[in-house]
Amino acid sequence: MQTLRKILEQAEANAVAIGHFNISDLVTLKAVFEAARDLNAPVVVGTSEGERQFIGVRQVAAMVKSLREEYDFPIFLNADHTHSLLSAIEAAKAGFDWIVFDVSTLPFEENVRQTKAAVETLKALRPDILVEGEIGDIGSGSEIHDAAPDLRKGLTTPAEAKQFVDETGVDTLAPAVGNMHGMLKSMVAGNTKKRLDIERIRAVKAEARIFMTLHGASGTDDDDLREAIAAGMTVVHINTEVRLAWRRGLDSALAKQPDEIVPYKVLPQAVDSVKQVVAARLALFSTGRRARPAVQ
């Protein structure tokens, strides 16, 4: 089976993106895996520190490994938004394929210093592991928000992206380009969409020349996602849309079967609801547009 790095290289060459979907339990993992397998699309599942605390670090690593080995399918595991080196080391030792080391709330120079140290430590522990760094401000919480925070001052510049990549040695970069964690109530209702700064993505990519990840993509305009991928995004993170689909599927199942107490008779509708969202996103991410600056 191809390595995660090789799969990212192929996505980069074809100007398509790999889908990354956060999971919290077996229901969401099952849905993401089935959708990806149906489409024969490589996929990454991610768990934040909170999600890992609930599902278990070693437990989620074992589940993903079992799917990959039993079905010989390229599903990979990411330790999403890991805020401490100890937590990153725990995930690396458990067998995670990728670590998002996120200390982006710190001043830039301190972010560089800590991320560089994390890269060195994690690569010494597991030379094959991928490490991502984050710069800029994209808010916090894959939840439903009443209003959008003002993130304009936290947008990533091409110059700082290049400096960050050069000084830290990260494998992938998560910039702030108009993206935002979570969704607004108006987005959930279908009345508004997130819009991205496509020219900023293109400019950051041209300077950093590295795999780039779009975090906080739930609720983003479809055309903007296509353009963002064409401009240089190699990975796209979806979490809030997965959570919404899980809740809607579960609510629908319980409404139809109010007296049902058997989990395996209720949960399949939540699986199907999440699966539909994941399949639609994977199909969108796999549509290439045009050539973009290569990763060196």
Where are these regions (language model features)?
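C-terminal alpha-helical cap/extension of soluble enzyme domains
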Residues: 221-296
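Thr-Gly-centered strand-to-loop micro-motif
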Residues: 214-216
